[in-house]
Structures are given as C-alpha cells and as structure tokens.
Amino acid sequence: NKDFEKVNGLCLRDKENIYKFTNPRALISDLDTVPYPAYHLLETDIYFEHSAYSYSVESFNSKRRASTCWERGCPRGCTFCSHNGMSRIDLQNIYGDGDRKKGEKLVRIVDKENETFQMPARWPTPEYAINNVKLLKDELDVDFISIVDENMTSNLKWTKEFCRLYVEEGLDKEIKWGTLGDAPSVAVKPEIVKTMKDAGCTYISFGFESASDKVLNQDIQKGQIRAHLQKTVDTMLANDMTPLTTFMMGNPHENIDDLMETLDFWIKNKASIDPFICTPYVGSPLFYDNQDFVLQQYDERLKLVFEGKAHVDKEIVAKWKLSALDKFMTDCGDAFQYTATVSQYFTIPELFALKNFMYKHDARRLLQMAHQRFEQTK
C-alpha cells in the first residue's frame, strides 16, 4: 500500500496519465553484497552452442564460454556512449527536465546521503570476482570467460590483485579470459598487459574510435590521443597479442582530412578495419547536442519549423518530436539498422561510400572525393 511516488528511482504515470520521475535512488555502495546470478535458472546450453568468439584462438575454440560484468559506471565521458544513459549525466537530464544544472542540484541531495554518485566507476573486491569465476566453473563448467568490463586496464591496483589471485587459484590454467581496455592506461602503464596475459588473458579490445587528434579531442572526448593508440598497438605486439581495435566515422566535425589521418594509421600498422558509423544513441551527449538535427531526419516537418519556414503550435511540434523520437529509438533497437547522421560534412550515402573506401584502404578514392568537394566550393 506504499505510495509509489515516495519510492526513489522510479518512472511512473500519475492520475492524469502523465509520466514523472521520483527522486534519484542511491547506488549500492558495497558491490560485494550483490548476489551472483542464478545460473541454474538459465538455459545456458542454448548460449554455449554459440560460444566461438573470434577475438583469440582460445575464445574461438571455446565450447562453454560465459560473459560476466563486475564494473559499474565508467571513468570516461565519451560523447557517443549510450552508457551515459545509465549515469549521472542522464540523471541530471531527467531530474532537471533537460536542464542539467538544475538536475545536478537534485542529484547532489543523494550525494550527501550516499557517496556512490560521486564515483564515476565502481568495482566489487577482486575476491568477489574470483569467487564468481569459481562459481561459473563449478556450476556451468565454463572453459572461457569474456569479462565485459570496459576498464580493466584503468584500475591497475584492482586488476593486478585480480590477476594475482587468478594465478594463485590455478584458474589461469583452466579458464582463459578476455576483456576490454583503454589506450591511455596502457600507454602510461604498459606492464599491465603482461600481467594480464600471464594470468590467462588472451585478448584485450580497445575503442580507438579515430586516429585524428582533432576528432579525438573535439568529438570523442575520451581523453586519448593518437600517440596513446600507437603506444598501445606497440605494447600489444610486444606481448605477442593481437591489437583488437574499433573505430567509428561520421563524427560531427570529422572531414576527409581526418579520415585520411585514420587511414594513414591503419596502413602504417597493417590493420584491416571495417569502421562503425557514428550513432547518436539517446542518453549520450552526442544525442543531446544534436537532438533537433536527429529528429528532423525522422520528420521533415520539424526541419521546416526549425528553419522558420512553418509556424506550428508548440503542442503539435512537441507531438511530432515524440513521434520522431519513437521512430528513431525503434531503429536503434537493431544494431544493423542505420539510423541518423550527426556529420556536418557528409550525407548518409556518402558515409557508406567512405566506409567502403576506408575498409579497402582506398586512399585514392578518398582524395578523389576531397578534390571533388574542393572543385564544388570554387
């Protein structure tokens, strides 16, 4: 019989059927108190049939691979990342009704009661993680673990202790593993790669995004530069591990010169990469900064209103925006469905052409397009 409006952390509809958010809920301060998943309730054999994962020889040959995630949050604030939709940034937008400064005041109320909101990333203890691996071994007889934490190379103290315990328990001989990392941490502390490899790690995947310092600083905002990327590649090769990297194109301020810088990086490192096309997921700063432009691509009437060519009642425009947002979010449900562009330089067809040129290392076609653009501006 509790009043739901007094329960923190809910999104609900009131008596007038209008949705509202209750106050923020404090995060769990001690992640060791979180119960392990009830693996016995899952139909795991369905998943084990698709265990092969082409990130390393060991992951590809695995027959009973499982994934696990221990990290909560992220120490970075990449503009494109949908994880921001589960972070303080999203809380600020929700509780401030789009005004992050206003929302921050409300979130700070929770800060006074619980310090977890002040921490960009949180982990359980390494012992908790090791016991989780043991549980997976005992209950599911797994032969490989994909640790989907995105920052194992960032928290050096935690990762070193995890690796020490992993070897101490003899797990490195029985269950190989792989994870994700970040270039700046590896560039500054390259020894972490050897530590992880010696503990059974067979792959580390990195989100490089672009090899243009301009794009990395202006658009991506991950806190990394091209020099970090090169140092990471060199470190991985020195440890006999294949550098696994992902890139994206179609960033707001990315032009052909920037794409040429990225292609130059690929060619120098003999890398074969099929880049993703930048997607402004809802909840990310990339979406909030380009919201009008994104929604106009799903309803051309909004573009006319935005350009002042049509004068429509605000309530009607609001309905159009909600409808466009619904269509956009539906498309985002399929990773293979291209959605909207945020590029200031290229149309959607051009992005697909450029993606093909990049994948084929076709610098000639890229330069040809650049010359065509130059001629058109004369």
Tell me what each language-model feature is:
Residues 1-15:
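A charged, well-structured terminal subsegment
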Residues 11-27, 48, 52-56, 65, ...:
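C-terminal accessory regions of radical SAM enzymes
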Residues 23-26, 121, 221, 251:
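Pocket-edge positions in alpha/beta enzyme catalytic cores
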Residues 40-244, 264:
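Radical SAM [4Fe-4S] cluster-binding motif and immediate context
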Residues 181-184, 209-222, 233-258, 276-282, ...:
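Conserved strand-turn element in the central/C-terminal portion of the radical SAM core barrel
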